[in-house]
Swiss-Prot record:
This is Telomere-binding protein subunit beta. Residues 242-262, 376-385 have a biased composition (Basic residues). InterPro entries: NA-bd_OB-fold (IPR012340), TEBB (IPR010874), TEBP_beta_dom_sf (IPR023113). Residues 231-329, 343-385 are annotated as: Disordered. Heterodimer of an alpha and a beta subunit. Residues 295-304, 312-326, 365-375 have a biased composition (Low complexity). Its main location: nucleus. It comes from Sterkiella nova (Ciliate). The gene is MAC-41A. The lineage of its organism: Eukaryota, Sar, Alveolata, Ciliophora, Intramacronucleata.
Length: 385
């Protein structure tokens, strides 16, 4: 493929059809005949809403009574409400433009809905489709919503040109002169249509009126009323809620949730405070930890220090030592060593001279034995003489 050539852009069939309808002022007869071909669709959902997709967007088809009867006559063993994940071919169809309440109909926008009316269709049970993307609501597409807004704006311009003429236009100069005086607020407002409130509804298109069946009626026809009630219990009557009532309920629900979360937060905070109080109660302070003997320092059983009411032993002063270092043992000089010996002998009761010898205390052991041998030798020498 050359640089200048580009791959053909794929487009949604539903988006193209519905856009053509709005661009032709809602007149289906003006839609190109090349687009009016059978539609092969994938059924995204069959109850409580019947939704079909072209792989890009989903829309809601509306079945006529004739289409449902024909389907049941040709396919008696197949239910329309059981076509989820199946493929259907819509042979005969048309498009209509309706004015609806978008707060209740989710397949609409700005109170306008383009409806796919099904006159004849059949299932294609042998074919299976695997969508490569998740389809979204066509009426939530930004580009398509812009198309609907343009349609509304064009209708509003047409209504203004039809009702407002030069004779009934307000003289702006008179309105400006009366600005400083008391007057009506709507003195400079020109009413362009008979719409009530701020919602414009004076459209010139011909609204469709083809009769169709609700999917709930088709469900009852195929499975009975009891099955419908059971299905309604499972789905809880799914509806699109909106408007002031819906907002009020949502706000009340949110406020209730905040109160419940606040109560939960208070109870959890109280539990945390109780746990902290217990820990503080049973944790000894720094002072008590100093006096409390550790396992390795616990006195032996039977000693007087372990008796109740005994005096606490006053710790003695530490022995003199050298400078502390993390790299090696204590560095002790000779003077410090002499001081250590003096301290040690004072503790035992003796005295040490500057040379390090013990004064005023007779040594025991080998020294006494040597002195005894020397005295015997001297006696023998004297006897020989």
């Amino acid at each position: 493929m050359s640089k200048g050539a580009s791959a053909p852009q794929q487009q949604s069939a539903f988006k193209q059809l519905y856009t053509e309808l709005f661009n032709n002022e809602g007149d289906f007869s003006k839609v190109s005949s090349n687009l009016k071909k059978p539609l092969k669709c994938y059924v995204k959902e069959s109850y409580p809403h019947f939704l079909v997709t072209d792989g890009y967007f989903f829309v809601a088809p509306y079945f006529t009574k004739e289409a449902v009867n024909e389907f049941h006559a040709k396919f008696p063993n197949v239910n329309i409400v059981d076509l989820t994940d199946k493929v259907i071919v819509i042979n005969n169809w048309s498009l209509e433009l309706r004015r609806v309440n978008s707060a209740e109909v989710f397949t609409s926008y700005a109170n306008l809905e383009a409806r796919l009316i099904v006159h004849s269709f059949k299932p294609n049970l042998q074919e299976r489709l695997n969508p490569t993307r998740y389809p979204v609501n066509l009426f939530r597409d930004d580009e398509f919503k812009t198309t609907i807004q343009h349609f509304r704006h064009t209708a509003l311009q047409a209504a203004i040109n039809k009702t407002v003429k030069g004779d009934n236009l307000v003289d702006i100069s008179k309105v400006a002169d009366a600005a400083g005086k008391k007057g009506k607020v709507d003195a400079g407002i020109v009413k362009a249509s008979a719409s009530k409130g701020d919602e414009f509804s004076d459209f010139s298109f011909k609204e469709g009126n083809t009769a169709t069946l609700k999917i709930a009626d088709i469900f009852v026809q195929e499975k009975g009323k009891d099955a419908l009630n059971k299905a309604a219990d499972h789905t809880d009557g799914a509806k699109v809620k909106g408007g002031a009532k819906g907002k009020g309920k949502a706000a009340a629900k949110a406020a209730k949730g905040k109160k419940l979360s606040a109560k939960k937060g208070d109870s959890s905070a109280a539990d945390v405070r109780k746990s902290v109080d217990k820990i503080v109660k049973y944790t000894p302070s720094k002072g008590s930890r100093k006096d409390t003997p550790q396992k390795s320092q616990a006195p032996a059983a039977g000693k007087s220090s372990a008796k109740k009411g005994g005096k606490k032993a006053v710790p003695s002063a530490p022995s003199p030592s050298g400078k502390k270092s993390a790299l090696t043992t204590d560095k002790m000089t000779m003077a410090q060593f002499v001081k250590y010996l003096d301290w040690h002998e004072k503790k035992k009761g003796g005295k040490v001279s500057s040379g390090g010898k013990v004064l005023g205390k007779r040594s025991a052991g080998k020294a006494s034995a040597t002195s005894g041998k020397a005295s015997k030798a001297s006696k023998k020498t004297a006897a020989k003489k």
